[in-house]
Amino acid sequence: MIHSDKKHYVVFGTLALLILLLVAANLFLGSVNIPAQDVWRILGGEEAEKASWTFIVWESRFPQCITALLCGAALSASGLMLQTVFSNPLADSSILGISSGASLGVALVMLAGGGTIATGVFTLSGFFSVILGAFLGAVAVLALVLFLSSLIKSNVMLLIAGIMIGYITSSLISLLNFFATAEGVHSYMVWGMGNFGGVSLEQLPAFSLLTVAGLLVAVMLIKPLNALLLGPRYAENLGVNIRRVRNFLLLATGLLTAVTTSFCGPISFIGLAVPHLARLMLGTSNHNSLMPVTLLAGGALALLCNLICVLPGESGVIPLNAVTPILGAPVIIYVIINQRRIQYFN
């Protein structure tokens, strides 16, 4: 037990140090080459050699660091909770169709609305209309999932219903793409590639507040999640209200997925791969240790992905969803090969 606790502390410390190093790397490296001494001056509140460098560090790189850290943690926490409640190692935030709902909302704005949301009261265009469309789409699907949750007792049936919702939204998106203009299709395709640079410094407080709120709910669910590892009957004998826990979990994952997808686009593999990576590092399915390690590992992986995206320098920025499968897929393959050695739901 002492050895196990020591191992967990080592993992915590290593991940925390890795995050600090990756944050520093993301601040000092980017598509624009800024000398290290000037980055230090900017971070210290002094003037740099060029005014544009100050703008790049504070208005671009700093928000991207915080966004990547929170987004990685949010997606990973969602994946862990869904894998536990559905006892399915392949569950993640996209499996209930919530991220597909966000994608449908954006498709309606970009492909059908020409990038504008117009009502009799106000008109919203540009990036804000995309964020609002994604958020409303995700919340609409979340409301539908919560409604189905009140009717369907079986987790497996609810999972299947969520997958069907995802198929329906994907079909609607395909129809919108078919009838849309080439410019609209291109804009939607770029959004679908994912990007941590979509949150400005002014939007960062709202993004952080909503994400942290969802993460706090996830942390509060650690005890009932551990009870669910024993099975629904044992959990009920321990006084856990299965349906209430499931609804809270759906609400938390829905909020986290809606916020991250609306601001950053649909990001693949992080929510699916990181919980497995955390289990591999800890060798346990106890959420008291697993949840914090999952949050840290998710933040670290997202920061690493963001760093890789800007490595080409002035040649351009690599799409985020071109990087995440390269890092996430090998983890899943390793899990499939060594699934008997990994503690999942017991």
Segments the model singles out, each with a brief description of its role:
Residues M1-N346:
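Alpha-helical transmembrane segments in inner-membrane proteins
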